[in-house]
Amino acid sequence: MAFATINGIRVHHVIQGSGPTLLMFAPGGFRSVISRWTAQGGKREWKEMDALAALSRHFTCIAYDRRESGLSGGRIEPLSWDLYVQEAKGLLELAGATQAHVLGSCMGAALALAFAVRHPQACKSLLLHWPVGGYRWMMKGRTFFARHLDFVRAQGLAAVVARAPQGENFWLDPEIGPWGSPAAVYPEFASELPKQDLGRYLAIAERSRDALFNDTMPSGASGAELMKIETPSFILPGNDSSHAYSASLALKELMPNAQLWDLLPQQQSGANTLAEILRFTRYFESRASALS
């Protein structure tokens, strides 16, 4: 297992494969971990495909556990899209790359959009797989934050630490909140969490909720920001309560250089998803080679 400290946070990551660099933002909501790219952990999104193994045959893949997820650490501060992409930029630099194709799945697509807004020169293309958004996604996030806030008000932060090892992460057990995962992994984080001023902690959690689940638009970028993303983008749509088809349509409408795959999830397979990713990225690789 490889770890790097970026922005003061210990980040569990993997860099493997060969070929053009592919920066990968994992699916899973607040379970955004490397294993969600594997055959076992990612079978919902990738069907029969082991995505990391398959993509590593064509790309130099950079995958990681997002901060406050899996084996990565965290910090108690207002969470935002700006914070979420800082570790990714650091990992890109760690890999010695200045540019990458950027693949984001589920909530990872929101991070891919946020990354493109802040680092457009680092993005060769955007691959947005099952982007999150819509009313039901917003209400899921806000409801989970409400459950955490109610739990902390009733039982305190020590109860979060006690419950975290069984709950594993915020998306599986909302009561433990966004910082339950690092509390379950890192003893020093677990010892510091109960010492937080309760009012300050609750305010930080509320600010995080309002930054990440503020409207029914596709998550990760505002409408105005989406209209300024010039990066060539390929949208692989979802169609359920978290990955609303309307979110993919909104991205296609607002992003000036976006294409929308005309297959819904029930028609998507690991094989045809991989084929579309390779088709889209190879076009830009061949064009870049012709210009060099």
Where are these regions (language model features)?
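Gly/Ala-rich beta-loop-alpha elbow adjacent to hydrolase catalytic centers
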Residues: 104-108, 112
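Short beta-strand/loop motif that positions the catalytic acidic residue
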Residues: 229, 235-237
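Conserved acidic catalytic loop of the alpha/beta-hydrolase fold
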Residues: 82-100
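Conserved alpha/beta-hydrolase "acid-adjacent" motif
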Residues: 241-247
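Conserved HGGG/HGGXW glycine-rich cap/lid loop of the alpha/beta-hydrolase fold
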Residues: 6-73
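Flexible "cap/lid" loop of the alpha/beta hydrolase fold
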Residues: 110, 117-118, 123-155
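Hydrophobic, aromatic-rich cap/lid helix
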Residues: 180-222
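Catalytic active-site module of serine/aspartate enzymes centered on a nucleophile-bearing elbow/loop
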Residues: 256-292
